[in-house]
Amino acid sequence: MENHRSVFSNVIGDIVEKPPKQLVEVKRSVQRHARGFPAVSRTLPKRESKSMSAYKEKMLRKNKESPGLEGKGNLDDQGIDEENRVRLERMNDLEIEGAQEEIRATIRDDLLEMLKKRAFKKKAERELAQRKDRSSQVNTPDLSQRPSDDSFLSNEKLRSSEKLNRNLQSVLSSEAVDSSSGSPSPPMALSQAEIRSRQTKRVMFPDKAEELTKIFSLPTLAPIKGNEEDDASEDAKHSPKKHSPALSDGTTSNDGAPLEFDTTHLPEKQVTLDPNDPSFYEQLHDKYFPNLPVDEKQMQWLHDPSPAENSYHPSVESLHAHEIRFGFKGEIITPSQSQTIPVNEGLHHHGDAPFSAGYTLVELAHLLRSSFPTQRCIAIQTIGRIIYRLNSGEFREVLSPELHTLVEDAHIYELLAAAASDQVKHLTVRSLAIEALWLCSQSQHGSSRSAV
């Protein structure tokens, strides 16, 4: 045992109790809250500020790698325009004419005219913007006073200003020739005095001269001799002409020639249509549908029926079975009664004898084939009541044989059986057809064959 103790004492050692250290008391500050819970901090924890987020840095790097994406749409449009121009330059006259014929064959005339007007409008706007740029360049100081190192830029601006001067001079000269003689002639260069005389134009009216004075001014232009005729012809070829009729109320300029104004900004006179006018439908077509062809057969239902079309008139001495008209309850409507029934009863239609009220058996058989369920239901219900009265002997022996023959020739029984079949999905049509067949079977007396 002693040996074991010596071994453990060498390994573990002696257990010695040390004196305790001096304890430091920590005073806790007890905070009392009014509601029993600690107050919530209103400030968020501060985050480490970064100069740029990863997403922004990625997008910035992407924009640097692919510059010019903002004007991608304009570049695509310019590329398409250049490709079309190159293709047109490679085509000969026959190919161009063939392409034009193909376009005319595939596009309607009114749509093609609309596209042409849109193209002319865009072209005019583009030319107007170019002229404004040129006029702003003309109003710049004298380019000849620039230093020699800017000679190239000054020459380019000088050429553009010269071309603008020639264009305006050609327009003024053509207006002067048209107002004096009325015959076209090649434009000529104007002198400095003529240009100054055209700078200010006054329009004088005899009644209110002071109130209606209008001044037209042009920028001062120096006459430049050159290829005026070529530039004028080129501008006249590419710019659409505007017809400006001269004023007819005595409006004149300083030199006595009538001034011309563009009246396209004025609204067109509104034409009021009179329904009582005999040519009302022609005016209606010209105002709202000028590009559509006129088909008289399709327009006949708009016109009032003529007296000659009224074949179901009291003055008629005899009638056939297919001309006899019936009401919705299956009763016969006489010619005199058909003239007195008002239109709001629903018995007038655009069939034969539109002045007369009622439906014939032929018209009802036609409505039995209608794809509109309401029309089909009215026809089935009316035919069922007519056949019930017919088989009951209500129409007497004078009309009954002819009406029985007409019912069989019009295949009315077959049409009713088809409407009552399971293939018809409309339940109202099926139920009314079954009811009509039941009425036919209950009153089967004078028919040559069974109704069902």
From Swiss-Prot:
Compartment(s) where it occurs, according to its Swiss-Prot or TrEMBL record: Cytoplasm; Nucleus
InterPro entries (UniProt xref): RNA_pol_II_AP1_C, RNA_pol_II_AP1_N, RPAP1/Rba50
Cellular component terms (Gene Ontology): cytosol; nucleus; RNA polymerase II, core complex
Biased composition (Polar residues): 136-154
Any GO BP annotation: transcription by RNA polymerase II
UniProt keyword annotation of Cytoplasm present: yes
Signal peptide extent: none
Region (Disordered): 60-83, 125-202, 223-261
Keywords in alphabetical order: Cytoplasm, Nucleus
Compositional bias (Low complexity): 170-191
Biased composition (Basic and acidic residues): 125-135, 156-165
Assembly and binders: Interacts with RNA polymerase II.
The protein's role, per its UniProt record: Forms an interface between the RNA polymerase II enzyme and chaperone/scaffolding proteins, suggesting that it is required to connect RNA polymerase II to regulators of protein complex formation.
Family recorded in the similarity comment: Belongs to the RPAP1 family.
Protein name: RNA polymerase II-associated protein rba50
Gene name in the database record: rba50
